[in-house]
Amino acid sequence: MRRLLLLARADNFATGSLFSFVLGVGLYGLTYLYPVYLARVRGYSALQIGETMFVTGICMFFMAPISGKLMQRGVDPRIMLAVGFTGLAVGTYQASLLTSDWDFYELLVPQILRGISLMLIMIPVTTTALGTTPPWKLKNASGLFNLTRNLGGAVGLALINTLLNKRLDLHLARLHEQVTWGRAAAEEALAKLIEKMAHFGSDASLAATRKLALLVRKQATVMAIADVFWGLTILFLLIALLAPVVRRPNPQGGGGD
């Protein structure tokens, strides 16, 4: 472990690329996860999802020049990285508490934190990765570095989708154990649904059973999405703790001996 820390201090490129990889997970992964919740749980259309998520774009638009100014004034990029990833972690932690009733206002703060945090990371992460790289290595290093963000997004999306499906299956199995014949709560809920759907006549029982199955699946989906948000919270916190370990890059840009 000590050797890894010394290596990170000696050369920021590997650590900066790791930051960029995780940034890709946060940038593309969260862009995927929020619409999944809004579409599958809330039943939103594409337009409604866009109207709900535009807050993040606005925050990024206004935060971009502020982040640039902070870099110009000599703010330590390691601090900006730590604050940015911590902000992402706080936002995903809040999102991990979501329920099936969450709407625009409940998602507002997590989205604001996401927009601000992403812009606090995007500029410093490049400076951190390439600021200590020798000039003769910059051409190859910059190309490889730019790849890491897209790679992080691709891998992140695959892992998020896999984890989401596995947790959905797990929660469905657990909820199905609770919604069975002989359980008073389940039978009471089904009886209420049958009463509400009496207008279906002889098909009321079948319609109520289908409705109950949909409710169970919706709740399992919410729980699975919350689990993924919690996993992302841990990831962002761990990467934030790594920020103070790297060397402070040259304020003048890439270069070194």
Please give the residue ranges for each predicted region.
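Hydrophobic transmembrane architecture of multi-pass small-molecule transporters
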Residues: 145-248, 254-257
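Transmembrane core module of solute transporters
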Residues: 1-140, 252-257
